[in-house]
């Protein structure tokens, strides 16, 4: 279920993508699980990004949304899991490649 994508630097990275549907501006949530980062207490977390269908458009959304702590997974609602990354809009895939560099 974890999606592997090649970023703009040519490195394969693992992301999880979720979809809230078209009722919200920041429809897609991307969890960058390839980076195993620890906070000041040694707890692992993953960077989370949010974007619209066209994150590079002046009226689009494409931003860092915070951090995901796996041990607190019951506290998050990211939407429905996207199983096939290739089914995403091309601009969203481009955004994922950019943020995972």
Task: Describe the role of every protein-language-model region.
Residues 19-86:
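Acidic, low-complexity, intrinsically disordered interaction modules
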Residues 88-96:
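A short, charged, amphipathic alpha-helix used as a generic interaction element across diverse proteins
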């Amino acid at each position: 279920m974890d999606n592997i994508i090649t970023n703009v630097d040519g490195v394969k990275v693992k992301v999880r993508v979720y979809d809230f549907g078209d009722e919200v501006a920041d429809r897609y949530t991307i969890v960058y699980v390839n980076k195993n980062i620890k906070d000041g207490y040694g707890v692992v977390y993953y960077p989370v990004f949010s974007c619209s269908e066209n994150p590079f458009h002046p009226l689009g959304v494409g931003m860092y949304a915070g951090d995901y702590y796996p041990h607190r997974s019951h506290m998050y609602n990211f939407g429905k899991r996207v199983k096939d990354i290739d089914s995403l809009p091309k601009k969203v895939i481009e955004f994922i490649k950019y943020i995972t560099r």
